[in-house]
Amino acid sequence: MAYNKFKIEDLQSKLSLPVEKEDWLNKNLSPFANDKLLMQVLIEAKKAYLGSEKARSEFIVTPVLQALYRQNKGKFTIFSGYEFNIDKSKALNGFCDFILSSPTSGFIIESPAFFIVETKKNDIDDNAIAQCGAEMYAAQIFNERKGKPQKAIYGCVTSAYSWGFIKLENSIITIDPNYASLSFDNPYPPLAALQWILNKSLAN
């Protein structure tokens, strides 16, 4: 078993993490600055076949995260397709789609704070949420071992067009029921949420 095999019920039964739905994202998010490069990339993405998870990752999700990075250079590092093995006895092992970690000069994760899981389908499903929750719990263990505990670990599950946000705080997984929508003409709602969460993570 690995992160991507977790079910929602496993978070409670195997990791003792209750799962709740509650509004926790700020509803008055600051607008994300216009990113001309992202808009150019999305214009080209319109012409591509986007029927697979890999295509959506390459043409939409990755460019969105790169835009976030451009606005916050030096504040975090993006790890993509990273093998994050923490505790195989609890199935806390496997590859993560994206990890946002504290900045590092090398290629080793220092203090992971944010996980992004891409759905296999065109919408957000419970399996992707469970995978994200397990990865967040693993990050909590990792940070505690490193002597860098964080008040909260954050996560996001995305189909590329819909972005759902999750947090792990006080041993509770909380899913915000309000998803952020991305369109080719307006990719900024999820970026505004990502920026707000990044600011919260940096303040941890």
Question: Language-model features: where?
Answer:
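A short, conserved, highly charged catalytic patch centered on acidic carboxylates
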Residues: A2-N4, L11-D23, K27-K151, K167-N204
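Short, conserved secondary-structure transition motifs
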Residues: V157-G164
